[in-house]
Amino acid sequence: MSTLNNSVLAISPARESKVRKLSEVSHHKTMDHATVLPWDQDIDRSLYPKDPEHLWINGTRYCEGLSDAQKLELAWLETGRDISMFIWLEQTIPPLYMGYITQFHDRISPDLQEYLMIFSKEEIVHTLTFKRFMAKAGLKIWNPPVGLYELLTQTLPKMEPAVGVLFTLLIEWVAEMGAMHTSQGAAVEPMTRTLFREHHYDEARHIAFGRWISESFFETASRESIDQVKAMSRKIIPALIDMFTYNPEIALHTSFEFPIAVDDKAKIEEVWRSPNNARLNDARFTEIYAWIDKLGLRQ
C-alpha cells in the first residue's frame, strides 16, 4: 500500500503504477473542446439521438398512441436529461477533488494528486463541451438530480476522499453506461454519437481510477467505515438507477400533454418497474451490477 503516513487514499504499488499510466495517456490524448466536434456543422434534430427502443416509457401503456414526432421529441428531451446529468455531476467533481488535495495535501501521494488534478481538468472540459452541445441542439439544461446533487456538494466534501471517489464513480458509471448503450447505433444522429463516444475515452479512465481507489478502500478500511459506506450505498444505488431510468421532470418539458404527471407517484413507479426497463437496465448495467454485488453494495 501507499507508504505515505496516515494516507487517506491507500492504494497498492501495482495500482498506483496503473494510475501513473492513466496520467500519461491523459497528458497525450484527452478531449479537446475546440476540435472534438465539427462545431460549424448542424445537429440534425430530425434524427434520433438515441435508440428509440430505449425511450423511458417504451413498452408501457403510456407510449401507446404517441405519434412519431412525439417519440422523436421525447428522445431529444431524454438526451438533454442525460447530458444535464453529466453537467451537474462533472462540474461538482473539480471542487470536490481539488478540495481533497488542498485539505489532505500531505496525506495523498503525488501520483494520486496528479491524477485527481487531471480528472478535474477533464471534467471541466467535458462540462464546457456538453453545455455548448446543448445550446447548439436547442436543448434546455434540466434541474439538478434530486438527492445526488446534495450528496456531491454537501455530504461528500465532509467524508474521507476514498468515499467521495466511490460515490462519484457510481453516479458517473451509471450515467456513462446508460449513454453509451443507447447512443452508438449507426442510425443515431452523428454529432450526438460522436459526442458520447469521445467523452467515453476519458470516462473509461475515470471509471478505472474510481474502481481501483474503491477496491483499495474495501481492502484496507475499518469494519465500521465499510459498514457505513455499504449502508449509504444500499440507499443511494436503487435511487440512482430509478433516477436514470425515468425522470418525472420530462412532463414539464414536452410540447404536448405528457401521459404521466410530474407528481403521479403510482404511474412513475409503474414505469420504473416496467419489464422493458428491467431488461434494459440489466443489459446496460451488467458490469456495474457485477462489481457492486461483489462488494456487497446493494444487498
Residue ranges: model-predicted function:
Residues 193, 209-226:
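Soluble, non-transmembrane catalytic domains of enzymes that act on hydrophobic metabolites at membranes
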Residues 82-83, 116, 165, 196:
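Short alpha-helical scaffolding segments that buttress acidic/His motifs in well-ordered protein cores
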Residues 1-113, 136-147, 158, 162, ...:
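Terminal targeting/low-complexity segments that flank the catalytic cores of oxidoreductases
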Residues 86-94, 119-130, 134, 168-179, ...:
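Alpha-helical transition-metal enzyme core signature, strongest for iron centers
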Residues 132-204, 228-239:
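Active-site-proximal alpha-helical scaffolds that flank and shape metal-associated catalytic sites
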Residues 99, 181-184, 215:
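Short glycine/serine- and small hydrophobic-enriched flexible loop segments
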Residues 112-119, 195, 199:
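Extended, well-ordered alpha-helical scaffold segments
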